């Protein structure tokens, strides 16, 4: 069952100054971060943002806020395993949304459905067909919610991570939106203009939980296998957070 958190908008000390696209991003991390002004497709000004976690969505949220776009966060990620990891990632995302008064849609943790769809793909590599299935599943729900609740545009913060295949993600987003005449998928490149680096800076500033694998049980398995082979300690759920230094 979906629930909405619509906390009162609070003022923030963060510099959300937006500038025209021709302006360059300043390189000094201690200087005010000057952004390009974003525009939604077809002149729309209402957006549904599918979010996977606070670190990936932090820069995306601040960029959207800087441009004065009305948006709501949609958290639907049944792939995340185990439940403890899922809850930590969700609560971190809620914490950041509350800071700026952003509505947050907490969608169902439809874990069994995800496992059913993943059958036969348990040993597929990262960025393979299992990941396509996972993006399809999440974006199908996001597009459906956008259609039912009057959001003409939806997008996702998934593509900001350099661990992901942006073309794969965008293909899934467009495929989900094609089912509805009144929904557009916005395939904005969140990595450009220093977006990926800014993502890390915000994560450190906010001291977000630092997840060490993509999210699903198979990603956790493969990450721990690599760690074992390279003499590293296995992942401990809920332990690692970004530090300011």
Swiss-Prot record:
GO terms for molecular function: 4 iron, 4 sulfur cluster binding; epoxyqueuosine reductase activity; metal ion binding. Belongs to the QueH family. This is Epoxyqueuosine reductase QueH. Its EC number is 1.17.99.6. It catalyses: epoxyqueuosine(34) in tRNA + AH2 = queuosine(34) in tRNA + A + H2O. Pathway: tRNA modification; tRNA-queuosine biosynthesis. It is an enzyme of class 1 (oxidoreductase). GO terms for biological process: queuosine biosynthetic process; tRNA modification. Disulfide bonds join 214-216. InterPro entries: QueH (IPR003828). SUPFAM superfamilies: Adenine nucleotide alpha hydrolases-like. Keywords: 4Fe-4S, Disulfide bond, Iron, Iron-sulfur, Metal-binding, Oxidoreductase, Queuosine biosynthesis, Redox-active center, tRNA processing. Catalyzes the conversion of epoxyqueuosine (oQ) to queuosine (Q), which is a hypermodified base found in the wobble positions of tRNA(Asp), tRNA(Asn), tRNA(His) and tRNA(Tyr). [4Fe-4S] cluster binds at residues 52-53, 131, 134. It comes from the Bacteria. The gene is queH.
